[in-house]
Amino acid sequence: MARAGGGGAAAPERAGGAARPEPWELSLEEVLKVYEQPINEEQAWAVCFQGCRGLRGEPGGVRRIRDTADILLRRDGSVGARLEPEPTTMVVPPASSEAQMVQSLGFAIYRALDWGLDENEERELSPQLERLIDLMANSDCEDSSCGAADEGYVGPEEEEEAEGGPRAVRTFAQAMRLCALRLTDPHGAQAHYQAVCRALFVETLELRAFLARVREAKEMLKKLGEEEPREKPLAELDHLGHTDWARLWVQLMRELRHGVKLKKVQEKEFNPLPTEFQLTPFEMLMQDIRARNYKLRKVMVDGDIPPRVKKDAHELILDFIRSRPPLKQVSERQLRPVPQKQRTLHEKILEEIKQERRLRPVGAQHLGGRGFGSLPCILNACSGDIKSTSCINLSVTDTGSGSQRPRPRVLLKAPTLAEMEEMNTSEEEESPCGEVALKRDRSFSEHDLAQLRSEMASGLQSAAQPPGGTEPPRARAGSMHSWRPSSRDQGFCPVSGQSQPLPSSALPSSLSSVDGPEAASPDTRHLWLEFSHPVESLALTVEEVVDVRRVLVKAEMERFLQDKELFSSLKRGKICCCCRAKFPLFSWPPTCLFCKRAVCTSCSVKMKMPSKKYGHIPVYTLGFESLQRVPTTKATPTLRRDAFQSLQGPKWRSVEEEFPHIYAHGCVLKDVCSDCTSFVADVVCSSRKSVDVLNATPRRSRQTQSLYIPNTRTLNFQ
């Protein structure tokens, strides 16, 4: 860029005919006169730093700074002072002369910043620059501390820095330190300020060359169209528009350095980083040209745009597509098969759960020889002599009959409804004869037992009649199925022509007596053993009772639909479900286990049950921790209360002692309302009576394990 500046400065001189060399240095006053305006703050910082650096490092010779004309700017960016033309005879101490130079430099910089302004006009400076000039200008060299200080002594400087800043700048080092501290990188202060001074020098030469060229152009225009005499003073032409051109030049340089905005949307944000002064604007423009940071316009060739430039991007893309091989039709394309998604472990488990459990097929010859099974629990799980009361094996053998082969002991689970239907169908197809229509019922109660006795008696009486007699009455649907003897039971189920009628009083007497079935005939004894054991009623669990009770309670709640307030209070648990007493606002009443309704403490009973899942707890193992706390004024049925109290007796044993294997893991107490207590007491009583009947009934050859459950007459729900 020095070449550009030099060429610009030499052009007017070549035009004038005098070939003068480019100046190597310029005074600060010449720079101010060329620009016709003061220097900016960045240039003032640079002149101060470079001036202190140049004055401190220059060899001997007396140098004085009286005005801006004594400060010299050089092409390489250094700054010096003009030598004193007249020799001085007075000897000045080094420290005193350095302080005077610092003070004179501060005055000169202030005049450069205030150059061209009126007397009543003052320029606003930044606080840092104003403080620096104030410290440099107010340094008094006649101070006693200044005259007595040694050149190599830096004690006061350290004290001043420790106090938060110097009170006066008397040395070049102090001024340079303050100039460097304002930069983000104090270590690069020398390079930065040298670049600023170099740019100021080069731009001044370029501006002076530009103004000289403008002045020469105006003179040429005046000579070509001059009609007035040439005695017009040349100074008037020189000063014509000089300030305007200088101002435009400074504005142009600023825009080239800081960037140009085509449209000012908002004010430029303050950039804390210093402006780059390593290159002049022309050098930066040349660097952009070399790096091709520009966009070229369309160039016409022979009055037309070249064909490669004329085509737009869309046409080029179409040409490229046409040059490629043709694509296949969609119908001809074959996609790869979708890879089979591997099922996760969670999906496999869900699929196994959804699938029905498949049973292993059993031969038809074993269906007739099986008993009615046992309860759904494992007999082998009970170790020692203590057997689970829910594991009952009813498959017995009859050794008294020579024509019947012994039945194997098989432990079966209670079949489902679908399996029972299949078993009934297969038994009807295989059995050629059937005399008594009997079917097991899941809820086998005392009423069903009495009905079974009457139906069996009537069936045997009809079997004793001739073949042309009346047809025996059919059993109620859903409770018993038609029983027909198999081939192995021919010994005790004779054909109508060969069978001998039994006395009509034999079966009722044997059915009415629980302890004396041994005296009955083998046929009657077999029928009693097969159909008098309500096995599936023993398999009734707490979970099933809870489901039944919920259905009943839901039906009972429909009665209160007319009274919406009562129905809402019962549903939300605001009142007791038994006594209709209202609960306090911030209370937490207990909830019944079976009906899930809120109940007060006076209407609730603590029920004892094993610490197991509800689906694994037989209902006959439940007990009550305390008697039912029901006042006599409540509308509780008297029969239910009497049935509950009749279960108590002088000889009682707790449920933990009766069922130690079930209560092996402890027990829990649950709250039950009085209504559900009566319901559960009836279910438990019926279940235990059925178990008593089962235990009191003798087995063939005594091969089955009896239940360790005492009589209900001496049983207590505890």
Curated annotation (Swiss-Prot):
Segments of skewed composition (Low complexity): 10-21, 496-513
Leader sequence segment: none
One Gene Ontology molecular-function label: actin binding
InterPro entries, per the entry: KIND_dom, Spire, Znf_FYVE_PHD
Annotated membrane topology: Peripheral membrane protein
CC per GO annotation: cell cortex; cytoplasmic vesicle membrane; cytoskeleton; cytosol; plasma membrane
SMART domains linked to this entry: KIND
Tissue distribution of the protein: Detected in oocytes.
Phosphoserine: modified positions: 374, 443, 445, 479
Disulfide cross-links: none
Region (Spir-box) location: 538-558
KIND domain sequence ranges: 26-207
Acidic residues biased stretches: 419-432
UniProt keyword terms in alphabetical order: Actin-binding, Cell membrane, Cytoplasm, Cytoplasmic vesicle, Cytoskeleton, Membrane, Phosphoprotein, Protein transport, Repeat, Transport
Superkingdom, natural source: Eukaryota
Principal location class: cytoplasm
Any Pfam family hit: KIND
Coiled-coil spans in chain: none
Functional note: Acts as an actin nucleation factor, remains associated with the slow-growing pointed end of the new filament. Involved in intracellular vesicle transport along actin fibers, providing a novel link between actin cytoskeleton dynamics and intracellular transport. Required for asymmetric spindle positioning and asymmetric cell division during oocyte meiosis. Required for normal formation of the cleavage furrow and for polar body extrusion during female germ cell meiosis.
Protein name: Protein spire homolog 2
Taxonomic source organism: Mus musculus (Mouse)
The gene coding this protein: Spire2
